[in-house]
From Swiss-Prot:
Any Gene Ontology CC annotation: hemoglobin complex
S-nitrosocysteine found at: 93
Name of the protein: Hemoglobin subunit beta
Organism from which the protein derives: Tamias striatus (Eastern chipmunk)
Keyword check for ATP-binding: no
Positions carrying Phosphoserine: 44
Family that this chain belongs to: Belongs to the globin family.
Domain of life (superkingdom): Eukaryota
Keyword Calcium: no
Modified residues annotated as N-acetylvaline in this record: 1
Residues annotated to bind heme b: 63, 92
A Pfam family: Globin
Tissue: Red blood cells.
GO terms of biological process kind: hydrogen peroxide catabolic process
Length: 146
């Protein structure tokens, strides 16, 4: 992902305000609710029958944190996202059989959650920067698909 110096500063500053414990669960929970067909990949998570169940689900929160921790790692390697996410791409492709379109959906949900939590600090320019990054991460995660 190519970012300008200003975009990198903005990205770093805003991401420093993110709490992966909180936002990860919210982003994954919203994905599962807005795009309910994604729930089939999370059969082991227990009750996902309602918004209250999904958003309060400890496994959703824990996996959401894990997702954002991986995303944070990717932010440290913007020049090598495919390498950074190679093993996760392989896992999601070969073992989990996740439709790579879901990575784009989750990226867009994450941008929405960031906008909600960061408020006025999440300017249109910041949104543009994050959209570039989530698109790059989604592309990297889809890299191992045939």
């Amino acid at each position: 992902v190519h970012l300008t110096a200003d975009e990198k500063v903005s990205l770093s500053s805003l991401w420093g305000k993110v709490n992966p414990d909180e936002l990860g669960g919210e982003a994954l929970g919203r994905l599962l609710l807005v795009y309910p067909w994604t729930q089939r990949f999370f059969d082991s998570f227990g009750d996902l029958s309602s918004a209250v169940a999904v958003m309060g689900n400890a496994k959703v929160k824990a996996h959401g944190k894990k997702v954002l921790d991986s995303f944070s790692d990717g932010l440290k390697h913007l020049d090598n996202l495919k390498g950074t996410f190679a093993s996760l791409s392989e896992l999601h492709c070969d073992k989990l059989h996740v439709d790579p379109e879901n990575f784009k959906l989750l990226g867009n949900v994450l941008v929405l959650v960031l906008a909600h939590h960061l408020g006025k600090e999440f300017t249109p320019q910041a949104q543009g920067t994050f959209q570039k990054v989530v698109a790059g991460v989604a592309n990297a995660l889809a890299h191992k698909y045939h």
